[in-house]
Amino acid sequence: MASTKVQPNYGYCETFFVESYEDTDGVFAKAAAERERARAIAKVQQKHMAANLSRLTSELYLNDVLDHMEVMEAETMPDINSIEIQTEIQWFMRPYLLDFLLEAHHAFQLLPETLFLAVNLLDRYCSKRVVYKRHYQLVGCASLLIAAKYGDRKERVPTIKELKSMCCSLYDDDMFTQMEWHVLQTLNWIIGHPTVTGFLEIALSETAADAEVQNMATYISEMALYHKDFIPVLPSVMARSSLALARYILGRPQVHHPEWAARYDSNVVM
């Protein structure tokens, strides 16, 4: 007697472990679409809640954050007079090194604040140690490496091999590691320096978004890195001055910042 194989007919079940042979009514497709829609709505709600919490928290602690940033920026400024007495490195060499750092910063797609922090670490190290001309670029690479590790995404941090290649193999691998360690020890592991970009973000958060003003202010701040006269200028003052100049260049009206600008002399800023 020949046996007949009966095709099983499972009913609809909302599980990933049971499959039916047919979906003539499109039930599964509708359920999957509904799940994706629910996930998308949940993500939007989460982002909205996070933005509100971030805004409320920033408003609550803004003054405390600014106070801490001002203390830190004063404690982590380089001494231009100490750099002046360097025997081998001269001021005309600094723009060439900054060109190199800016190129490396762009090549590795690092955050804007990483560049400002790297230059701060470089100048602070040169304020405390005698730097030979042949090691000047090495100090710059070590400063960029430390700054990237401190505030950038892990996958963007340059490797020693990449830095060595950019330096045309002028330094051995272990020299980068040794210089990185020496910079950290010299600065007593105090890396956190409030950069111009940090103060720019705070100032811009108090006004309507304007990408052109932000980009222009950042560009002005980057250009100021090349001039030694701006080395002693506090990042907070530089940020406000860059914003004021950017608005003037772009023909934007000057904005009054009641909470933040009141801390500074308007004559210094403008």
Task: Mark where each language-model region is.
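Alpha-helical scaffolds that organize eukaryotic protein assemblies
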Residues: 200-201, 212-216, 230, 237
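A glycine-rich beta-turn/hairpin centered on an aromatic-Pro dipeptide
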Residues: 205
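C-terminal region detector
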Residues: 3-5, 10, 224-240, 244-270
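Acidic, Ser/Thr/Pro-rich regulatory low-complexity segments at or just upstream of the first helical elements
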Residues: 1-138, 145-202, 215-223, 249
